[in-house]
Amino acid sequence: MPKRTDIQSVLVIGSGPIVIGQAAEFDYSGTQACRVLKAEGLRVVLVNSNPATIMTDPEIADATYVEPITPEFVEKIIAKERPDALLPTLGGQTALNTAISLHGNGVLEKYGVELIGANVEAINKGEDRDLFKEVVEEVRKKIGHGESARSYICHSMDDVLKGVDALGGYPVVVRPSFTMGGAGSGFAHDEDELRRIAGQGLTLSPTTEVLLEESILGWKEYELELMRDKNDNVVVVCSIENFDPMGVHTGDSITVAPAMTLTDREYQTLRDVGIAIIREVGVDTGGCNIQFAVNPEDGRVIVIEMNPRVSRSSALASKATGFPIAKIAAKLAVGYTLDEIPNDITQETPASFEPTLDYVVVKAPRFAFEKFPSADSTLTTTMKSVGEAMAIGRNFTEAFQKALRSLEKKGSQFTFVGEPGDKDELLREAVRPTDGRINAVMQAIRAGATPEEVFDATKIDPWFVDQLFLIKEIADEIAESRELTADLLTEAKRHGFSDQQIAEISGLGEDVVRQVRHALGVRPVYKTVDTCAAEFAARTPYFYSSYDEESEVAPREKPAVIILGSGPNRIGQGIEFDYSCVHASFALSDAGYETVMVNCNPETVSTDYDTSDRLYFEPLTLEDVLEIVHAEQQAGPVAGVIVQLGGQTPLGLSQALKDNGVPVVGTSPEAIHAAEDRGAFGRVLAEAGLPAPKHGTATTFGEAKAIADEIGYPVLVRPSYVLGGRGMEIVYDETRLEAYIAESTEISPSRPVLVDRFLDDAIEIDVDALYDGEELYLGGVMEHIEEAGIHSGDSACALPPITLGGFDIKRLRASTEGIAKGVGVRGLINIQFALAGDILYVLEANPRASRTVPFTSKATAVPLAKAAARISLGATIAELRAEGLLPALGDGGTLPLDAPISVKEAVMPWSRFRDIHGRGVDTVLGPEMRSTGEVMGIDSVFGTAYAKSQAGAYGPLPTKGRAFISVANRDKRSMIFPARELVAHGFELMATSGTAEVLKRNGINATVVRKQSEGTGPNGEKTIVQLIHDGEVDLIVNTPYGTSGRLDGYDIRTAAVARSVPCLTTVQALAAAVQGIDALNHGDVGVRSLQEHAAFLIAARD
């Protein structure tokens, strides 16, 4: 039955900023869906607050709204655009919850908008834990299989305590309703833990409801991805097995597809139950994902939960099988059936054929505990990983070792040298699931543990344990052999060993192993992902490496450009870099090159099989990239490799690639060194006559102390060659400096520590620019709202700048040009400046695409990444202006006076992390980056744009109520004006004694409240922390004091996180918030699409 004719326009809701549990996979699914719907001739309206996504590019939808995803704003868009239908299943939990509220408050009915892709009843049956239990019971009556864990629904703490007795005691699982990524869930082993976890769960659940369940810790966990159309055709797209047993959130687990340890009969049972559930719930046009637990002792099957939408697992399943779930879900939503949709990859089989795999896929999660030293690293049912890598191999060991190597983290690959340690101690360590458990298991095996002991400690299935033993046996063979023979190398490679691992075991250099391997002719071949186990020919070149017989890479005539992606998402290197890689691929395709993408992140648009001409799903290590370059050179001419778009990962490979004779295009490895190495960069600045803050490099504490004494404290210390401010700290005195040097283990003459003067009270400025060797194109100038010293990735910023004048822009332009020329950039460069008093200091330069490129491109309506890719391959700025890729006149520094103002705000993952005692982690911003994503607010005035950015990131700013203020002495003077404004807007102020005193002297009334350290008052007056916990505070302003006195502040800020109260930690943020509150109180806040903003900017240029 072909598509419906009664729908002309569709509103698609995106997933907003990247947070833990809801990441780039929704950009991938949303982009696919928008393209499909547009190709079907529908008008597509999109709302998504995240500018770093491909889906918010103006060409993907017909009208793109970068606005907060809240029922209020989405209603404004519906009123303006009047769509016929709303598709909410592609934007994760955010989109689903928003659609449910719009349905509930009558907005959809009022404007005559139909929900497609999922009906409200099906969403509720899948999401509401009580209704879902009934569904599972129905299924069991019909087919005799499948049950739910015994459970108890609670709406208050009294219910919760009763529930434990009803379930027969601890441990119990706590799960809140309608949350995502396991937010607020956990295992409680005693009453203290129960009160803490359930209290937070009741707060986080929009329906104040939590479910207590019997514990099924240690059971095997599986997932099925299914799709169903309105004619009741159902396909099982993929089965996924979790390597880690129940108790670890599936997003934090190593997962394997297809499932490895199910018997045929067990698999059929899961299939039957899954198909019966999707029918019973009533998902009739789209995909869903169902999670199961199987008791290894008696085979009892429990259905854990389902997601009636496109999820993180569906992105993984799509990449693992080549079956594009999101694309097909969008087609089903507008009326097609599965048998009418062709399979893109074979082009001769329909989508109703279930994919079959002749390879194994392994996904491994990437964590960021090093960014939150106080956080508890135990893995639980609350998701904590920030990214993932996927690898494909011909067997489990090969895919598994490739996945670990793809994580690009020190110590992520198995190591087989040195003493493993004490067996019993290692087994004890392996009992607690953490990000490094798998390495502890391998060391325990090396120390002589038996398979039974490993299983008892970890409950990892015996089949997987055997595979780990197999990997260790191969390592022993390499260690015992006298020489590297062709047979030995082939065997090691077939089990996923890297040259680096083989080199370490045999005591040789990595390059020596590679030379021997090439001399013996042991090289990988590349196989195609074809959805059908080679039964039909694949038309899309989507490759993975294997040490097999024949290669499937076809020869070509056109010159190829190889683009290195950014690998797994992590804090500091996220989807923004993927955005630049995808744009480069599009631009170079248009310019007549064959584009080749290399990446291993399954969540992204870059690893979609139709983004580039060829896709290699491979780790981004030197060995893997060199083999791909070799394979492509055999196939046809290679114009070069682009390393400057994928962030720090490919940048770090540039010199080694060049040394191996690979043509690196764009900014040369030498130029990268000139910007990254402080000594070399100092010389560039000196030649251009530009001031940098006083600094020096040190390799010992003595040297560091001498520099700090000469510069004066506070100083900023950091290692060289890092991204995301890794390991940076502002040091206020000598004792802390000594401790910092002692903790930084990796100091060496080639990797010194940098000591810079820290500029207090400076305005930080970020510039993105293009340089072709002759001419500079200033992409955009962003003025940070927070002061210098807070990592630029965590700071909010405004473009065009709000307090800089024409003279400042002139100076910035001249300095940027001087640096770009001195370093030798060809393409993009990002420079951070600090304006202190009247002096413009250069903080650092990055000779690559920065994380602000997508934001700058959207704010100025110019595709910077596309232009950069062309410049890398020799185009000039003048040529690109003539072609129309860049504006004919002017640039991002000459925007019209009435240009819209865009504000970027960073989104932090504080709420996901707890320390071992269950307290939150501190929310103070510093020089080390901790945000996972970003949102953008755009409007004609700064106040409204800032208010939108806050609404998109943390929920709307309060417009009345009680505000608590407590600031450090250095901030007291600058706090008076914004505080007075708050009172004028009708806020009631509360403050600690010191701050209240200053306010009173300035004629501002504030109620004095007790600090946490003072305890409850004699007449039971609550402390500020108790007031926050009781929901009596609407806005918190708390700036930290130097290094001491942080503890009171810490308690206040962690309480704010636990209760989701807006908490501002700088006076600058307070001043911006006041402008935002003012805008909200005064005016009707409107919405405009990016296309309308762009039309305005383009008209202003002519």
Swiss-Prot record:
Residues noted as binding Mg(2+) 1 in the record, renumbered to the chain = Q291, E305
- Subunit structure, as described in the record: Composed of two chains; the small (or glutamine) chain promotes the hydrolysis of glutamine to ammonia, which is used by the large (or ammonia) chain to synthesize carbamoyl phosphate. Tetramer of heterodimers (alpha,beta)4.
Q: Where does Mn(2+) 4 bind?
A: E844, N846
Binding-site list for Mn(2+) 1: Q291, E305
Q: Where is this region: Oligomerization domain?
A: 409-551
Where the record annotates domain ATP-grasp, the positions are: 137-334, 682-873
Q: What class of enzyme is it?
A: ligase
Which amino acid positions bind Mn(2+) 2, per UniProt? E305, N307
Pfam families, alphabetized: CPSase_L_D2, CPSase_L_D3, MGS
Q: Where does Mn(2+) 3 bind?
A: Q832, E844
Q: In which pathway does it act?
A: Amino-acid biosynthesis; L-arginine biosynthesis; carbamoyl phosphate from bicarbonate: step 1/1; Pyrimidine metabolism; UMP biosynthesis via de novo pathway; (S)-dihydroorotate from bicarbonate: step 1/3
Residues binding Mg(2+) 4 are E844, N846
What does its UniProt record remark on the domains? The large subunit is composed of 2 ATP-grasp domains that are involved in binding the 2 ATP molecules needed for carbamoyl phosphate synthesis. The N-terminal ATP-grasp domain (referred to as the carboxyphosphate synthetic component) catalyzes the ATP-dependent phosphorylation of hydrogencarbonate to carboxyphosphate and the subsequent nucleophilic attack by ammonia to form a carbamate intermediate.
Q: Which CDD domains match?
A: MGS_CPS_II (cd01424)
Output this protein's name.
Carbamoyl phosphate synthase large chain
Detail which positions bind Mg(2+) 3: Q832, E844
Which Gene Ontology terms cover its molecular function?
Answer: ATP binding; carbamoyl-phosphate synthase (ammonia) activity; carbamoyl-phosphate synthase (glutamine-hydrolyzing) activity; metal ion binding
Q: Which gene encodes it?
A: carB
The scientific name of the source species is: Streptomyces coelicolor (strain ATCC BAA-471 / A3(2) / M145)
Q: What Enzyme Commission number(s) does the record list for this chain?
A: 6.3.4.16, 6.3.5.5
Ranges for domain MGS-like: 955-1100
One GO cellular component from the entry? cytoplasm
Q: How is the cofactor bound?
A: Binds 4 Mg(2+) or Mn(2+) ions per subunit.
Provide the function of this protein: Large subunit of the glutamine-dependent carbamoyl phosphate synthetase (CPSase). CPSase catalyzes the formation of carbamoyl phosphate from the ammonia moiety of glutamine, carbonate, and phosphate donated by ATP, constituting the first step of 2 biosynthetic pathways, one leading to arginine and/or urea and the other to pyrimidine nucleotides.
Which of this chain's residues are annotated to bind Mg(2+) 2?
E305, N307
Q: Where is this region: Allosteric domain?
A: 955-1102
